[in-house]
UniProtKB/Swiss-Prot annotation:
Source organism: Gloeobacter violaceus (strain ATCC 29082 / PCC 7421)
Protein name, entry field: Large ribosomal subunit protein bL35
GO MF annotation: an example: structural constituent of ribosome
Pfam families: Ribosomal_L35p (PF01632)
GO CC aspect terms: cytosolic large ribosomal subunit
Region: Disordered, residue numbers: 1-46
Superkingdom of the source species: Bacteria
GO biological process, one term: translation
Tagged with keyword NADP: no
Keywords of the record: Ribonucleoprotein, Ribosomal protein
UniProt cross-references to InterPro entries, sorted A to Z: Ribosomal_bL35, Ribosomal_bL35-like, Ribosomal_bL35_CS, Ribosomal_bL35_sf
Basic residues bias spans: 21-44
Name of the coding gene: rpmI
Amino acid sequence: MPKMKTRQSAAKRYEVTGSGKLRRRRAGKNHLLQHKSAARKRSLSTKVEVSETDLYKVTRQCPYL
């Protein structure tokens, strides 16, 4: 059976922590930032853990991550 291919677009969006969990960026911090508060922009800058419901989809797209 051939190796599974990694979806490169998905591989660029996630990073693995030291404990093996996946982290992702938050949505909403690319443009239209002038009306958002500084606190909101700061909180959007942090990375969050991928939820348990999405973990299956991400691991299918990036099997070797």
